[in-house]
């Protein structure tokens, strides 16, 4: 079992590169959205590119990686950048984004078969001035 370079791949600012970390029919659950389920590289690439376009200078820093004996990898990360593109319900205000999250990944060899992504939406909205 290998650990994908989540930080470097997201920081490449390419949705297609992000999707290449997954198996062909890989699944990404974005639990905080609520339970947005993306299946397949095309869906994952589109969603990733949408986020990259909203925060075009984004960088993902990895804080900790833990490998389980059962083929599970847990990654604690920080998504940072400047919110300079509009998204539905999240108008651009050029504010700093500093979002801490955790990904729990079921691996198939060196690729992610299924990922469950958790982050604190309230922190994101407060930073955007949308939550008091």
Question: Where in this protein do the model-derived segments appear?
Answer:
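C-terminal and inter-domain tail/linker signature
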Residues: 1-132
């Amino acid at each position: 079992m290998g650990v994908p370079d989540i930080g470097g791949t997201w920081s490449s600012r390419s949705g297609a590169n992000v999707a290449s970390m997954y198996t062909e029919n890989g699944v990404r659950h974005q639990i905080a959205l609520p339970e947005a389920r993306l299946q397949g590289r095309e869906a994952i690439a589109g969603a990733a590119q949408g986020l990259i376009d909203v925060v075009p200078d984004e960088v993902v820093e990895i804080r900790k990686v833990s490998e389980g004996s059962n083929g599970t990898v847990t990654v604690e990360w920080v998504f940072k950048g400047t919110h300079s593109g509009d998204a539905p319900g999240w108008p651009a205000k050029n504010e700093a984004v500093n979002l801490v999250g955790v990904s729990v990944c079921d691996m198939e060899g060196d690729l992610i078969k299924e990922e469950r992504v958790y982050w604190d939406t309230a922190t994101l909205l407060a930073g955007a001035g949308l939550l008091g």
